Amino acid sequence: LQQSATWLAQHRPGYRLLVLDALRPQRVQERLWAELAGTPLSLYLAEPTRGSIHSFGMAVDVTLLDPLGHEVHMGTGFDEMTRASHPEYEAELLAQGLLTAQHLTERGWLRAAMRHGGFHVLPTEWWHFDFGDKAEVRAGMPRVL
């Protein structure tokens, strides 16, 4: 994460990363799963027996802060579980006028910074980034309970 923050500071002076969510203990994941079971929002959660990468400490949710310390508008809010949050649909949403070129530019800066730190983007959440191979993480690392 430090590599991502350093890259951003070098390439976009004044802008910083803001961590919104990181380590999520297994018990919290189970509680979220139970609360959202049977709703469309459950599609955005990892099934607890499989495990969220957050529960292994290998995922982070981040956004950008501008030079004044304000969150940069990304077209949707953090944890807004809608199609407009999906990076995979950005071009389509831009064409429909549901996202702006500025939203995509800001998301692009965030992704570039995170990729320079070795993170991978999730196709359904512009704010979520995984570190490492999910299968290897689940097979070889302990979960925080």
Show which residues each predicted segment covers:
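Cell-envelope/glycan interface and biosynthesis
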Residues: 1-145
